[in-house]
Amino acid sequence: ALTLKVSYGAQGNDNLGTYYASSGLYSVVSNNGENALVSDRLATPKLKWETNLNFNAGIDFSLFNNRFSGSFDFFQRRSKDLLYSRPLAPSLGYNSVDENVGELKNTGVEIDLKGTLIHTRDFMWRLGLNLTHYKNVVTDLPLKDMPVSGVHKLAVGRSVYDFYMKQWAGVDPENGDPLWYKNVKDANDKITGRTTTNDYAQADYYYTGKSSLPKVYGGFNTAFSYKGFELSTIFAYSIGNYIVDRDVTMLWHNGSSTGRAWSTEILNRWTPENRYTDVPALKTVSNSWNANSTRNLFNNSFLRMKNITLSYNFPQPMIKKISLNSLQLFVQADNLLTVSKNQGLDPEQDISGLTYYRPCVPSPEESMFRSKALIPGKGLLQSYAPPRFNHA
């Protein structure tokens, strides 16, 4: 069987937070016994909804009496009048102003496949896979040179998830200072090359060629059944995405912050005897070496076993003797295995690509034992032993 599907529609987005209704209004405050009126945000009476124009096309199929099935979907979303909080100069008295700033296009594919690979009288093997790949491109902006926003900068032809950061250049072997790259310019202010600086404020921003958007992400599952037993697993994965890990940088201070924990990397710090290293020398004053740069930009690809379950369904002749329609015992565990290049604690993060003060424990490993019984006239009865947690 084959089914074709096509859809098109418009969708609005007004995700500006709850403060929008009070923008432009004043609050009465008191400071040192003096009353005053304070405005938190600039009024934006011409601000409009962000509009998303969505197009989807695909096919659903099934083969061999539904033994194999799946779907292929193509989608494109064109967004215009993008909602954006544009940073303002501190001299204006406001941090930012909400604006409709440009247009954006998302294009991608989604694939979902599942099938029964082996099916005999006593044994069955099922397998499922899904993946998503999409690209994100800014197509129009009101300004040629948009301001830097965190670790990103909007630019036509680039993704909103591209990292725009200062680039780490290593450690000066002569004195242990941290180094970053900065541009070299001629008399006409034209960039002619790059050099290094130990002053973080003098370093320039660059597009890194890395993105917080995965090249592909999704999951897969498999299940093996033999007579009444079944073993099933569920995996999630993400490939090609990067993350700026601000959690690990809290352990990368240079010694000027007393009483704080250190990463074990500090054992490889610069000393006169260890000149060629990537960890700067200890200092009594801050040198910004743990500030945002490509040094704390990590590959966040991962593979995680989300769940594994072993179950047993008792034979019908046996359970009918005790007035049950069905009886199943099973043991399951979550998050038993995670493979990741990221030094952080949990690779499953949001699409922003920036973490800070994440929970200080990874996703917990959880295991439990349960039983389910279907009782005629009374419905489903479940019982289980309390779960056990193990924080790896």
Give the residues covered by each predicted segment.
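Conserved small-residue
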Residues: 99, 116-212, 252, 334
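Extracytoplasmic gating/loop element in the C-terminal half of outer-membrane beta-barrel translocons
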Residues: 238-328, 333
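Transmembrane beta-strands of outer-membrane beta-barrel pores
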Residues: 8-12, 74-80, 115-117, 131-137, ...
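C-terminal beta-signal and terminal closure region of outer-membrane beta-barrel proteins
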Residues: 101-106, 149-177, 266-267, 272-274, ...
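Residues on the lipid-exposed face of transmembrane beta-strands in outer-membrane beta-barrel proteins
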Residues: 57-61, 72, 111-115, 220-226, ...
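Solvent-exposed loop/turn elements at secondary-structure boundaries
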Residues: 2-50, 69, 73-104, 147-148, ...
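Short loop/turn motifs that connect adjacent beta-strands in outer-membrane beta-barrel proteins
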Residues: 1-2, 64-67, 118-125, 138-143, ...
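Outer-membrane beta-barrel signature, preferentially recognizing the C-terminal barrel domain
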Residues: 29-69, 97-120, 157-162, 211-217, ...
